[in-house]
Each structure stands twice: as C-alpha cells, then as structure tokens.
Amino acid sequence: GQFKRNRSEGYVIECDGNRAIISAISGKSSGASDDYWAVGQLISIRVGENRIVGLIYEIKAEDPNWNPNEDHVVHILVELTGEIRQDKPEQPPYFSGGIKAYPYMGAVAHRIRHADLAAVYAASEGNIVTIGSLAQEASIPAVIDVDKLLSRHFAVVGTTGVGKSTAVTLLLRKIVEKRPDIRVLILDPHNEFSS
C-alpha cells in the first residue's frame, strides 16, 4: 500500500540559489520508524504555483542536547534539484530541472507529495526497463532508459557488500532483454559473475 506520510511543515530560513536551509520542529513522538526528515529523501518547497524539489543531504539539531521528551528545532539542509510544474489543472504535474523562482524566507517546505515524486522519476518515452522501486516510495517503480544508459559511460560504484555485483547482474539482464542485439563482455578476475 501507499506509505502514509507525516505532512508536518518546515520553513525556509536560508537560500543561496543552489541550496536551502529549512527550520522545522521535530516532535517528541518522532521515532526511527516514522522519521519524517531523513537524509536522501526528497522534499518540496512551495513557491507560488510551483513546488521546488530539494534533496536532503544533512539534518542537524539547533541544540545538541537531545531530550526525547521535548520538541526540538532541527535544520534540514537541502540541495535544490528542480521544480514540479503543472501547466493546467487537468494535466499531470511534471518535473523540470530548472527553477523559475527560488524559495523566499518563510516559504513552506514539506515531504514531497506522491504524485510529485512520481513526476520526478517518470519514465520518458524510450526503451524503458524497471529495475526496482524507489526507497522513498516503494509503490513508484525505479526505471532506466536502456538506450540513454548505453549511449554514455556509466559506472556502478559502492563499498564492499552493498550489492554492486547484484546490481550489475540485474542491469545486464534487463539490458539484454530489451536489446538482444547487444554484445556483452565481462572481465571477471574475482569470479563474481560465474553463475
């Protein structure tokens, strides 16, 4: 089912055009399972009719003395990545990598809406394959355009044990399904792809 989100709000207190800082209250009932502000999550900031999309890269408490029985002011640092636009009410929202109007002081920020998150990750027309689902919203598929992926260099990187070999195997299987004409050569000195 669809994840029910806490729609608590925060407010922009700083913005330089690339990044913004949002001030919010972390309630005393917040726990790890319902944590609303989390690194790696997308949020949205209302600016007129559009919603700026930001990626949370850091969260810090204003007061380092944390008491689980009290509310705390937290600062959420976000990188501005684009905006959600909707030209007409009857049309679905879409994501644009540009930003027409930047957040002002006091602009309202909240967890991104389901439809907006889907718009950010919407598949373009092309040779699309589903490789999983989004960590932020499992009901939204994670997709790639095989032709775009193969038209440029790409790498799968990560630390030991995070699943690089599994990811490469999945990618190769999906690519070959869509493009059976493609030739694949794997140099495997550590015998990770023997099966």
Role assignments for model-derived ranges:
Residues 128-195:
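Glycine-rich phosphate-binding loop of nucleotide-binding enzymes
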Residues 114-115, 121-133:
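Extreme N-terminal, non-catalytic leader segments
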Residues 1-120:
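Long, basic/Gly/Ser/Thr-rich N-terminal segments
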